[in-house]
């Protein structure tokens, strides 16, 4: 059994790493990819808000995570598709995320959970497909890690690798965000 203080440190560290990686990715990509930078910034803000729960209610923290998932992740994929000429997929992902963000109050907790995981997996798969066709190795890793985060969140287990499941998902999301930031940079270099 893992002690409660260790769980708190693990949770805080996973939020800090996700916030740090996402902030670095936002700053790195702001000049070349404003949509992706906005998506990374939403991830950063959601992770930081979760670190200071005394400033907000639990519902505010969940709302921030919801927005980072259903708007932030499609923003990340939007630019990846747009630059490769797949404008219809880019618009469909972003439009679907916006509709889900507005409909979040009507879905209920279970519906929001399923919709958030679906958005994560759809974004991961579409990034992976584009990365395979463009031979972007970082994009493949980013899509795979985002997919791992989505699949791990569906597991029934409370703990994975001696850590709380949510922490492992945040670590996978941070790794996917880092790889995706590198993929955007690689993609921009190929097009210039």
Swiss-Prot record:
Domain of life: Eukaryota
Regions crossing the membrane: 35-55, 63-83, 92-112, 114-134
Keywords: Membrane, Signal, Transmembrane, Transmembrane helix
Subcellular location: Membrane
Signal peptide positions (record): 1-32
UniProt keyword Ribonucleoprotein present: no
GO cellular component: membrane; nucleus
Membrane-topology annotation of the record: Multi-pass membrane protein
Main subcellular location of this protein, as a coarse class: membrane
Protein name in UniProt: Transmembrane protein 276
Organism this protein belongs to: Rattus norvegicus (Rat)
């Amino acid at each position: 059994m893992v002690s409660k203080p260790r769980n708190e440190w693990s949770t805080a560290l996973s939020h800090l790493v996700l916030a740090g990686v996402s902030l670095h990715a936002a700053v790195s990509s702001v000049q070349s990819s404003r949509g992706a930078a906005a998506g990374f910034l939403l991830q950063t803000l959601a992770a930081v808000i979760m670190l200071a729960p005394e400033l907000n209610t639990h519902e505010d923290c969940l709302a921030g995570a919801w927005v980072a998932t259903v708007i932030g992740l499609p923003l990340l994929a939007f630019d990846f598709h747009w630059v490769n000429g797949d404008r219809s997929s880019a618009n469909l992902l972003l439009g679907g995320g916006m509709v889900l963000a507005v409909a979040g109050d009507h879905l209920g907790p279970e519906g929001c959970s399923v919709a958030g995981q679906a958005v994560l997996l759809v974004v991961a798969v579409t990034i992976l497909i584009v990365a395979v066709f463009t031979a972007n190795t970082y994009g493949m890793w980013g899509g795979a890690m985002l997919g791992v985060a989505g699949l791990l969140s569906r597991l029934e287990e409370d703990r994975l690798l001696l850590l709380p499941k949510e922490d492992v998902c945040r670590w996978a999301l941070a790794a996917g965000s880092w790889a995706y930031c590198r993929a955007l940079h690689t993609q921009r270099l190929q097009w210039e």
